[in-house]
Design a protein with these regions (language model features):
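Amphipathic alpha-helical transducer elements in NTP-driven molecular machines
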Residues: 6-10, 26, 37, 66-76, ...
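Amphipathic heptad-repeat alpha-helical coiled-coil/stalk segments that mediate oligomerization
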Residues: 210-225, 276-282, 292, 383-462, ...
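Conserved catalytic alpha/beta cores of large enzymes that bind or transform nucleotide phosphates
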Residues: 173, 178-186, 518-551, 628, ...
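Charged catalytic and DNA/RNA-contacting regions of genome-maintenance
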Residues: 2-340, 349, 353-369, 373-465, ...
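Active-site phosphate-binding and catalytic loops of NTP-dependent enzymes
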Residues: 112-121, 260, 396-402, 461-473, ...
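ATPase nucleotide-binding head domains, primarily ABC-like/P-loop NTPase cores
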Residues: 37-40, 239, 309-310, 317-320, ...
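Charged, surface-exposed helical/loop "interaction arms" that form contiguous linear patches used
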Residues: 370, 374, 387, 405, ...
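Terminal-proximal interaction/regulatory segments of ATP-powered molecular machines
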Residues: 481, 845-874
């Protein structure tokens, strides 16, 4: 794309485009943002815009398309959603006043992770930008991870030092679900992470150069942002990796944003052990924030619990659901706050009424910092400030320690409210384009300019009358023409009475015309009043935004407290509406639930009776409930409801039960349902086994594990053997609380064989060949699988089910008396597999698998095979 022989404007375009080759450049020309060449081709295709051409001084016309500047956000949103970056090039001066070429410059680069426009954001979901820095030290990988929401100013970071660092990174990405991820070059070798991002997220991945993570760059960036004593302030040790991730994120914001980086005032550090571990599979299976089918909110735990009044509360609720606590003290602080709000019905109602008038001040403050807030948005901040005394008072009145703490955290922001109320009219315009936002009496010059605009003739009449009185010239008059502007005309007979302060401008046959400094000043005011008024109002509004920006820390702290109060009040409201109870949460390791219900299904079945069920799990006699019963009887619902009840308790919510005692669980693992992973080339059985393997590797004695129909994707004996082995491994090596549903009735003998296993089944009532699911879980194994009866309920033709009964009777009659269910599993325990050669064990223990290259791993495998063959032959 040659830059010679082009018009000055296009030369300017090329110079700016050269600085932003990877972004689509929105180039402001008058009332449009125009795109040229490759940008135009891309935008016209993605946005379905008409592609035209522009004469740029060369022989060929430049491909061009454009969008109106007043509606550009809609088009920009579509491009950003498709993973493009957009550089906004603005006119930096009024074209009417420009001398020569209008000055233009990039004011922002908008990327998926740096969006602040409310029209492009979901009000109930954070929009995170992530930064990951990893480093290998002493033979082990470590990582620093940072997540920041530019639209709210929140920033969170953690240090990861897990044996499987890739899995740990995926867990954090799953927790925050960023829309854009900055990575360091070594991250390209973490195929599990890059595969997860590619297959399970829509995040844009931005590879940052090694230079972005240099020590000097990190130190300078952190000092500039947080002060020279940043390590002490933020609590980072000398060898911490988080600062590198934070600094890379901040530098990226400096590159893309002209303003607003100062919105990030601090970084909240957390340890991954602070929160319950929830794998991507578990989050999907439990349908916490979106359904598996349709990816909708309705039908999720978030849908059931969302009784919030503010956008800030909605985002925080989602965050709490995605990050359940594991500290019993912190959990009980939330529960006590919910109990206080639940009991104080009047205070709760008043609090929720006040919260209903609170706007999204987190995101409003960011737009104020960027200078892009509208007068109405600033007025909304003022209206929110006006509600803070009521919010603070009602929270304090409830008495719970956490509510008192949050009430104390609320700053009434009286000075901010005063500034807004003093400066802005009660009903400000949607934007500053036509002015009219500044309140009368706030600025004398604004008042004068408005008076001049609306009453300029009055000013002239008053001045004319005063001049007549001062000079004694009765017929002195003030006139106007396009050549001289305003002038004073005196007839020839009174020219001797004209004072020296009058300057003669024109001689007429009938008299003289004069001007005075005062008249010219008034002329300038009248003729330029509207333009100067707009400029002055813009300046005063900018000053107001600047004064509010100085209080961002106070506003942010208040917004955080208000959001927490909103969620807690919502929990109390949900408990009241849905008949929830306060759980007893401790570190006992016990999970005892009386008449538990599935929180989502009971809401979906409004008007129908949901059958409640009890659960008893502990670390001794009841570590594993082995659940049998027919398909469709409710096994999966029962298991999921227990997982959801535990999770609800640990976010501080009351739970759907008559009573609940929840010993804190550090993680919930689920293996339910069956599906192929076609993208990864894995069969249903392979997916199932991979997920089970991850559970067995990562579960601890404090975890809750949900396993549904393990082994059904292969042959009966293979599946049964795998299921039995999994149960044994969990009970003997992990000891965690487990709900294990199976269609292998032969496994029910494990109650006698393995300590901690208890048989339960879903009760079924049978009449003839018809069955009724009672949905009630009872002790003991199921007496039948009822497969044919379920097939009949599903609608199989009667001829098919009748024939199935005939075949079943034939098979049962011909089966040996020693049925599969009577298999001697004890005999399996007596079978000893050949011992692994000690030489092989020594080699395996000595090798560091993570340091091997693919070739080294292959050679090592051949060496092991050779050792094994020699041992067997020997």
């Amino acid at each position: 794309m040659a830059e010679q022989a082009v018009s000055p404007m296009m030369q300017q375009y090329f110079e700016i485009k050269k600085q932003h080759p990877n972004e689509i450049l929105f180039y402001r020309v008058g009332d449009f943002y125009e795109m040229f060449y490759d940008d135009a081709l891309t935008a016209s295709r993605e946005l379905e815009l008409t592609l035209t051409g522009k004469n740029c001084g060369k022989e060929e016309r430049a491909p061009m398309c454009g969008v109106p500047f007043h509606s550009y956000e809609t088009y920009m949103a579509r491009l950003v959603a498709k993973g493009y970056k957009v550089a906004i090039c603005e006119q930096m001066e009024d074209p009417a006043l420009a001398k020569g070429l209008v000055k233009r410059d990039i004011i922002r680069v908008v990327t998926p992770g740096t969006v602040i426009e409310s029209s492009m954001l979901s009000e109930d979901k954070n929009n995170y930008l992530a930064s990951i820095y990893c480093k290998r030290t002493r033979g082990r990988w470590r990582a620093g991870v940072c997540f920041a929401d530019v639209s709210t100013g929140e920033a969170y970071a953690t240090e990861l030092n897990a044996e499987k660092i890739g899995g740990a990174i995926i867990t954090e990405l799953c927790r925050y679900m960023p829309s854009e991820i900055l990575i360091c070059p070594p991250m390209l070798d973490f195929k599990d992470v890059t595969t997860y991002i590619k297959q399970h997220t829509n995040a844009l991945v931005e590879l940052r150069e090694d230079a972005c993570f240099k020590d000097a760059v990190m130190e300078q960036t952190m000092a500039d942002q947080f002060g020279a004593d940043w390590r002490t302030t933020l609590g980072y040790e000398k060898d911490a990796l988080v600062p590198y991730a934070v600094a890379a994120l901040l530098n990226y914001l400096h590159e893309t944003q002209k303003h607003g980086v100062e919105r990030i005032k601090t970084v909240q550090n957390y340890a991954d052990a602070q929160y319950m571990r929830l794998s991507p599979v578990t989050r999907a299976n439990l349908e916490l924030t979106e359904t598996m089918r349709g990816r909708e909110k309705r039908g999720t735990l978030l849908w059931v619990l969302d009784k919030t009044e503010t956008s800030m509360g909605k985002r925080l609720l989602r965050s709490w659901i995605e990050q359940p606590l594991v500290d019993a003290e912190a959990i009980n602080a939330r529960l006590c706050a919910v109990q206080a709000l639940y009991s104080a019905s009047i205070a709760r109602a008043d609090l929720k009424e006040a919260l209903g008038h609170v706007f999204d001040i987190e995101r409003l403050t960011t737009r104020i910092l960027y200078g892009s807030a509208t007068p109405r948005e600033v007025k909304a901040l003022g209206d929110t400030c006006a509600m803070l005394p009521q919010v603070k008072a009602q929270a304090a009145a409830c008495g719970a320690p956490l509510l008192t703490q949050l009430a104390d955290q609320i700053d009434l922001l009286e000075d901010v409210l005063q500034n807004i109320q003093t400066a802005l009219v009660d009903d400000p315009p949607a934007n500053m384009k036509d002015g009219g936002a500044i309140r009368a009496g706030f600025n004398s010059e604004v008042d004068e300019l408005r008076d001049i605009m609306h009453g300029g003739k009055g000013y002239l009449s008053n001045l004319e009358a005063r001049y007549r009185e001062e000079t004694g010239i009765p017929k002195l008059k003030i006139g106007f023409n396009k050549v001289f502007g305003y002038y004073i005309e005196v007839s020839r007979s009174y020219t001797d009475s004209v004072p020296d302060t009058f300057t003669r401008k024109q001689t007429l046959t009938t008299g003289e015309r004069y001007i005075t400094p005062e008249l010219k000043e008034l002329e300038n005011k009248i003729l330029g009043a509207n333009e100067r008024l707009l400029v002055l109002e813009h300046q005063l509004f900018a000053d107001l935004l600047s004064s509010i920006s100085a209080e961002v820390v106070r506003i942010q702290r208040t917004a955080s407290a208000v959001a927490q109060l909103d969620v807690l009040a919502g929990f109390a409201e949900a408990a009241l509406q849905n008949n929830y109870v306060m759980p007893n949460v401790d570190e006992s390791g016990v999970m005892e639930i009386k008449e538990g219900r599935h929180p989502v299904i009971e809401q979906m079945l409004k008007g129908s009776l949901f059958v409640p069920n009890d659960t008893m799990l502990d670390e001794d006699e009841n570590r594993m409930l082995l659940i049998t019963g027919p398909n469709m009887a409710g096994k999966s619902t029962y298991m999921r409801q227990n997982a959801l009840i535990a999770l609800m308790a640990q976010i501080g919510s009351f739970v759907p039960a008559a009573a609940a005692h929840i010993g804190v669980v550090d993680a919930i693992f689920t293996r339910v349902g069956a599906s192929d992973d076609l993208a990864a080339g894995q069969s249903t059985f392979m997916v199932e086994m991979t997920e089970v393997a991850e559970i067995l590797k990562n579960a601890t004695k404090d975890s809750l594990v949900i396993l549904d129909e393990i082994g059904r994707g292969t042959s009966t004996f293979d599946g049964m053997s795998i299921a039995r082995s999994v149960v044994e491994f969990i009970c003997e090596n992990i000891g965690c609380k487990t709900l294990f549903a199976t269609h292998y009735h032969e496994l029910t003998s494990m109650e006698q064989d393995i300590h901690g296993v208890k048989n339960y089944n879903i009760a079924v009532k049978k009449r003839g060949e018809d069955i009724t699911f009672l949905r009630r879980i009872v002790a003991g194994p199921a007496d039948d699988s009822y497969g044919i009866e379920v097939a009949k309920l599903a609608g199989l033709p009667g001829s098919v089910t009748r024939r199935a009964h005939e075949v079943l009777r034939t098979l049962e009659a011909s089966a040996p008396k020693n049925k599969v269910e009577q298999m001697d599993f004890d005999a399996l325990q007596e079978y000893n597999s050949p011992a692994v050669p000690s030489e092989m064990m020594e080699k395996l223990e000595a090798v560091d698998v993570e340091t091997l290259t693919p070739i080294e791993a292959l050679n090592f495998l051949y060496e092991l095979k050779k050792t094994l063959k020699g041992s067997l032959n020997g």
